């Protein structure tokens, strides 16, 4: 059993792509979160530590990083839960992102892929005259609703092996968003969107490891969104045949 | 230390699926060449088949049958996830697929392969 | 191109689901009955149904295996691009040729 009065040993990644782990000792407190720990280090021990957070309450996703091998929101991760049977807390930046410094990563690639997958709403040419009635219980709306709570935290992108193996792969977040828009009956951009997700770096690369679904803090299931895109891709391919 | 995302059943399923597929793809040309020996009459094939009675070869044959059954079961799981609306209970489903593969292997063993 | 490969992979998988089940059942039956190669050939010799079924099996494999290999090689090795596609097309033809030859050999044995 760990001595709960002893300070917590925390290994923190310092540097960028190349670097090292630096160990800090942090006083334990009841119910402390990993974000509490990182903040303590930066404020009281080493002001040069770079990390991100914003809301502190599990709404923005800014604090995502890899904690003892699992990508998590640090504000919503209790130290006790993160440690499990381990005695040392290990903090790393999100995997599959370029590290800016220490625990802060460059999110540009992630959002570029979002755009490349056409993960944005395309209105019709005459919105005012085109008022859409969308029954909330319709299958398409339910499919869209299942994925729209994504806040772009990047955890699924970090967890995805295919993103690691093929850096061009659009990734679970971008594809999940694309699927919500495919199911949005008001959207007019589906031709370009289906082209984007059917291309070489698109939905077919998903091998259903399901790490994205496993680690999504919002409980979303990009695996099934991507499965929907695969079905749509096939339907389109068949429909095009003479 | 194995990464947390690699200790999930979905990853194990994908890895087994991939490795069994690789083994089968590499084995197939040899399988076809061996069978093709029959074209040259019974003798060349029989002398080749004598080689296959060695225990190591028999083990490899058994492993390939298990690989085939497992690859198919896990592949059907992928197709089910892609086509069917039901939500996969990953761990249980993967265990079932691997179990099916091993069951085929067991059947082969019990029937005097 | 990609959607076509994906569809070919899934369709060939559906065909293989049937063919592999047939093949596994045959293997287990043959082992159970203690059949030798000669015993098997006595059943396949001149058997047109066998030739057709296994011919379809070979065709499905020649489509399915190279596409699967393509993913593995692209993701686990630095090899990609046209060179890889050409090599895999060649592998597909190899499987087709050797496979049909094998089916024929067993048909004529």
Residue ranges of model-derived segments:
Chain C
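Membrane-embedded alpha-helical bundles that constitute the cytochrome b-like, heme-associated redox core
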Residues: 1-109
């Amino acid at each position: 059993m760990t001595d709960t009065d002893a300070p917590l040993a925390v290994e923190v990644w310092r540097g960028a792509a190349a670097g090292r782990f630096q160990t800090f000792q942090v006083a334990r407190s009841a119910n402390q979160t990993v974000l509490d720990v990182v903040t303590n280090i930066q404020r009281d021990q080493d002001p040069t530590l770079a990390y991100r957070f914003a809301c502190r309450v599990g709404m923005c996703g800014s604090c995502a990083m890899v904690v003892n091998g699992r990508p998590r929101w640090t504000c919503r991760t209790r130290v006790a839960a993160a440690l499990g049977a381990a005695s040392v807390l290990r903090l790393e930046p999100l995997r599959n992102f370029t590290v800016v410094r220490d625990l802060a990563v460059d999110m540009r690639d992630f959002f570029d892929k979002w755009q490349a997958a056409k993960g944005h709403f395309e209105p019709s040419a005459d919105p005012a005259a085109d008022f859409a009635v969308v029954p909330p219980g319709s299958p398409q709306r339910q499919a869209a609703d299942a994925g729209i709570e994504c806040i772009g935290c990047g955890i699924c992108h970090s967890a995805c092996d295919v993103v690691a193996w093929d850096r061009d792969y659009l990734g679970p977040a971008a594809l999940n968003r694309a699927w919500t828009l495919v199911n949005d009956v008001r959207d007019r951009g589906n031709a370009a969107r289906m082209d984007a997700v059917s291309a070489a770096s698109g939905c077919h690369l998903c091998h259903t490891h399901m790490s994205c679904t496993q680690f999504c803090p919002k409980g979303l299931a990009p695996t099934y969104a991507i499965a929907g895109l695969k079905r749509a891709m096939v339907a389109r391919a068949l429909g095009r045949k003479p | 230390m194995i990464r947390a995302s690699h200790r999930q059943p979905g990853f194990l399923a994908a890895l087994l699926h991939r490795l069994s597929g690789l083994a089968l793809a590499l084995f197939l040309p040899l399988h076809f060449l061996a069978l093709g020996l029959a074209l040259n009459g019974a003798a060349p094939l029989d002398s080749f088949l004598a080689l296959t009675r060695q225990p190591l070869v028999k083990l490899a044959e058994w492993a390939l049958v298990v690989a085939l059954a497992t690859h198919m079961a896990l592949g059907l799981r992928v197709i089910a996830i892609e086509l069917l609306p039901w939500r996969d209970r990953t761990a249980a489903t993967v265990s079932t697929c691997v179990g099916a593969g091993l069951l085929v292997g067991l059947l082969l063993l019990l029937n005097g392969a | 191109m990609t959607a076509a490969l994906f569809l070919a992979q899934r369709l060939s998988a559906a065909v293989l689901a049937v063919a592999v089940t047939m093949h596994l059942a045959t293997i287990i039956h043959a082992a159970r009955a203690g059949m030798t190669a000669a015993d098997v050939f006595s059943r396949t010799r001149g058997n047109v149904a066998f030739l057709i079924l296994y011919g379809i099996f070979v065709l499905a494999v020649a489509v399915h295996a190279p596409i699967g290999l393509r993913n593995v090689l692209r993701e686990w090795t630095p090899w990609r691009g046209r060179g890889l596609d050409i090599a895999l097309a060649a592998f597909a033809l190899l499987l087709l040729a050797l496979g049909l030859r094998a089916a024929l050999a067993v048909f004529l044995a």
